[in-house]
């Protein structure tokens, strides 16, 4: 298989990903800042489909209206010249000190109102540039002290904010949906809507739930010790996987943002298997940080590696599914039986069926092996390249 990506693969990157300068809580930047135009050009050359941005990635915070228009004009010219798309945009509601206690759930009312206006302004730009998804990550929406935040009231304010944003895009006629990005902690000690499940439950309370889905990130769910492919499966089951952030993570620790495929490779295998078999057609967005050990050549090598690893795993998972021995093992594991309704003949028939309870041979059923180990080893063989 050719592992050279093309725009048809729908791989996208945020300006903040390859543009990360390597600054962290313990050290200064190790790389120069990247011009967004340079980023667009380099990513296009690597075969990416598009680029995404926070408002402050593209337009430095505090820019005048004239400066803002100049930045947008240069960016648009780069997009037009390369054919790169902008499938998604988002708002930076976490960097400036004004957001130290959050944005939509800040205790200060004036900060909440400012956050809404800042978001609405960038929604206008996102729609202008053709984005179909608007991501919301509430990195500062949370607390370190149980006394500092009434979580029930904070969720009221969160709901109010999203309802207002939904009202705005509807009134403007924008073809735009929102994707809530969960994260359990960092930078706050505890963040509201920490997992996919929390976000899905929250969405059902909104006035226009059809406008809202989720943008799960590999590392964020794994920081909480959760199974990322399972979270994606539930989002797909709910019809709410509006966007996805791909990266790597090695267990429960800080948010590593490794390139995709680094970290938990088995989870990456099952994730690609799920996305491809489910027919996910949205952008495959890499939200990662090239390690601060790298120079700019290493940055672009890391970005290329994200796409290459996805394509390799796509090939390996397709071979796994097509393998006759795997198909036989799937039948032995009774996956086909799981697809059958448990009581398709209805409750009355279930209650009347003595083989379902009175005459059910519990010991014989308990003695049946599930053949999962053979099936899993076949998956490992394909992942490790030991089978064709």
Curated annotation (Swiss-Prot):
Reaction equation(s) it catalyzes:
alpha-D-xylose = alpha-D-xylulofuranose
Q: Which PROSITE patterns match?
A: XYLOSE_ISOMERASE
GO BP terms, alphabetized: D-xylose metabolic process
Q: Where in the cell is it found?
A: Cytoplasm
* Molecular-function GO terms, alphabetical: magnesium ion binding; xylose isomerase activity
Q: What class of enzyme is it?
A: isomerase
Task: Spell out the Gene3D superfamilies in the cross-references.
Answer: Divalent-metal-dependent TIM barrel enzymes (3.20.20.150)
User: Catalytic site residues?
Assistant: 54, 57
Q: What cofactors are annotated for this protein?
A: Mg(2+)
Q: Which family does the similarity line name?
A: Belongs to the xylose isomerase family.
| Protein name (record) | Xylose isomerase
């Amino acid at each position: 298989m050719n592992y050279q990506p093309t725009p048809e693969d729908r791989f996208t990157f945020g300006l903040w990903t390859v543009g990360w300068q390597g600054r962290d809580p313990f050290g200064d930047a190790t790389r120069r800042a990247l011009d967004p135009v340079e980023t667009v050009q380099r990513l296009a050359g690597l075969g990416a489909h598009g680029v995404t941005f926070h408002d402050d990635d593209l337009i430095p915070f505090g820019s005048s209206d004239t400066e803002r228009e100049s930045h947008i004009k240069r960016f648009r010219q780069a997009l037009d010249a390369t054919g790169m798309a902008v499938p998604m945009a988002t708002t930076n509601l976490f960097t400036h000190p004004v957001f130290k206690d959050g944005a939509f759930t800040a205790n200060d009312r004036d900060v909440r109102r400012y956050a809404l206006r800042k978001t609405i302004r960038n929604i206008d730009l996102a729609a202008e540039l053709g984005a179909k998804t608007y991501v919301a990550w509430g990195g500062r929406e949370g607390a370190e002290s149980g006394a500092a935040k009434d979580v029930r009231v904070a969720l009221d304010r969160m709901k109010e904010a999203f309802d207002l944003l939904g009202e705005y895009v509807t009134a403007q006629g924008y073809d735009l949906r929102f994707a809530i990005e969960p994260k359990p902690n960092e930078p706050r000690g505890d963040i509201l809507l920490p997992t996919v499940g929390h976000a899905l439950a929250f969405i059902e309370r909104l006035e226009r739930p059809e406008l809202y889905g989720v943008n799960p990130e590999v590392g964020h769910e794994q920081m909480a010790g959760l199974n990322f492919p399972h979270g994606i499966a539930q989002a797909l089951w709910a019809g709410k996987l509006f966007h996805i952030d791909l990266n790597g993570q090695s267990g429960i620790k800080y948010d590593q943002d490794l390139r995709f495929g680094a970290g938990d490779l088995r989870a990456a295998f099952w994730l690609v298997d799920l996305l491809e078999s489910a027919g996910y057609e949205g952008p495959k967005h890499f939200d990662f940080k090239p390690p601060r050990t790298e120079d700019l050549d290493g940055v672009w090598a890391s970005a290329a590696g994200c796409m290459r690893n996805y394509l390799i795993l796509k090939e390996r998972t397709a071979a796994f599914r097509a393998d006759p021995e795997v198909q036989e093992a799937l039948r032995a594991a009774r996956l086909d039986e799981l697809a059958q309704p448990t009581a398709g003949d209805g409750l009355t028939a279930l209650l009347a069926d003595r083989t379902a309870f009175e005459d059910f041979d519990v010991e014989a059923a308990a003695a049946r092996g599930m053949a999962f180990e053979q099936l899993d080893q076949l998956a490992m063989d394909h992942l490790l390249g030991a089978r064709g």
